[in-house]
Design a protein with these regions (language model features):
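Histidine/acidic-residue-rich catalytic or RNA/ligand-binding cores of hydrolases
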Residues: 8-10, 47-50
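Histidine-centered active-site loop/cap adjacent to the catalytic His
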Residues: 49-96
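Conserved, well-ordered alpha-helix/loop/beta-strand core segments that scaffold catalytic motifs
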Residues: 1-30
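Extracellular serine-dependent O-acyl
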Residues: 20-48
Length: 107
């Protein structure tokens, strides 16, 4: 979530969403690529305890991601990529970024 907070503070959100859409469309054209997106795992993303630094998850979260990939969870397809990107955009454009820092101060 700190990554998205940085994008928001720097005015880079829309550029990030556009880049993600372009990259997704290009990768979906590759027959030998499977693309996964876990930006909708809000309980993980929005909890700072799940990170080892500003952008990287703790090892146990990385293990969960590997389990999701093995199970096929989060697979992006031509049929679902636009709705996933729109859902992602909706959350991150409207997220209360101040709340993540307040929650950690109160603990």
């Amino acid at each position: 979530i700190c990554f998205w907070d940085f994008q928001n503070q720097e005015g880079l959100m829309m550029r990030q969403f556009e880049a993600e859409q372009i990259a997704t469309e290009m990768l979906l054209d590759c027959a030998n690529v499977k693309l996964y997106n876990f930006y909708d795992k809000y309980d993980i993303i929005c909890n700072l305890d799940n990170y080892r630094d500003r952008e990287h998850y703790a090892p146990e979260i990385n293990s969960k991601i590997l389990q999701w990939i093995q199970a096929g969870d989060g697979l992006i397809t031509r049929d679902n990529y636009m709705s996933k990107l729109e859902q992602e955009k909706e959350l991150y454009l409207n997220y209360d970024y101040d709340s993540i820092y307040q929650a950690n101060v109160e603990q």
